[in-house]
């Protein structure tokens, strides 16, 4: 029996159900009868739900269509991810750190809040997690970090994106320096007097992240 790990953005890149059907027919023609979907998103948001709905139509064509848990979708996965961030980033005591996720509009973004609390519980107190949209946004972060800077005397914030792929959310929404109607995270921090170190790296640039969340099927049932 042949299994395929199918990273979901490859399916979502098909903008119509006809294109999606063609992709799935190609898989069937190549002998695939099980599709294992690894969500390339941090939480079970709109994109994952959309893909689930689209694939539901084709479930009778395959013996199994199974979804792995998103990065922040379980306590075990979140704990692994927090340890991964500590190992990859290091969190030097010289700086404050801001991790920026996408978030969901109209959402409490509870997964990101839990990640922040988990990092603090592991002794990493100089880090906060914020989102581009929904609760826990950059405006809320600015209020919090200004107080922290007064207490710590630190001058510089290092920004890391909590986004898996390098795209416009990273290059524009977080790090853009161009004049636009909506200011980037970088611009908002600089306008509020903070010195910023940019780390323009998606999570997929970390080998440990790819090994755990993108390249293997160990989290799927047999």
Regions found by a protein language model. Name each.
Residues 1-222:
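Active-site-proximal alpha-helix that buttresses catalytic centers in soluble enzyme cores
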């Amino acid at each position: 029996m042949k299994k395929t790990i199918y990273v979901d953005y490859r399916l979502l890149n098909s903008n119509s159900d006809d294109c999606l059907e063609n992709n799935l027919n190609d898989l069937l023609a190549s002998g695939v009868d099980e599709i294992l979907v690894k969500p390339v998103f941090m939480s079970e948001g709109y994109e994952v739900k959309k893909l689930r709905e689209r694939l539901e139509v084709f479930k009778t064509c395959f013996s199994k269509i199974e979804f792995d848990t998103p990065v922040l979708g379980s306590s075990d996965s979140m704990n692994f991810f927090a340890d991964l961030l500590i190992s990859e980033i290091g969190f030097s005591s010289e700086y404050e750190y801001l991790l920026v996720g996408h978030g969901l509009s109209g959402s409490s973004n509870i997964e990101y809040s839990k990640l922040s609390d988990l990092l603090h519980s592991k002794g990493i107190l100089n880090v906060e997690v914020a989102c581009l949209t929904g609760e826990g946004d950059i405006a809320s972060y600015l209020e919090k970090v200004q107080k922290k800077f007064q207490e710590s005397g630190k001058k510089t914030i290092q920004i890391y994106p909590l986004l898996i792929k390098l795209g416009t959310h990273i290059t524009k929404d977080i790090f853009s320096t161009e004049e636009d109607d909506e200011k980037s995270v970088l611009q908002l921090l600089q306008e509020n007097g903070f010195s910023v170190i940019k780390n323009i790296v998606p999570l997929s640039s970390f080998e440990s992240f790819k090994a755990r969340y993108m390249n293997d099927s160990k989290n799927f049932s047999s």
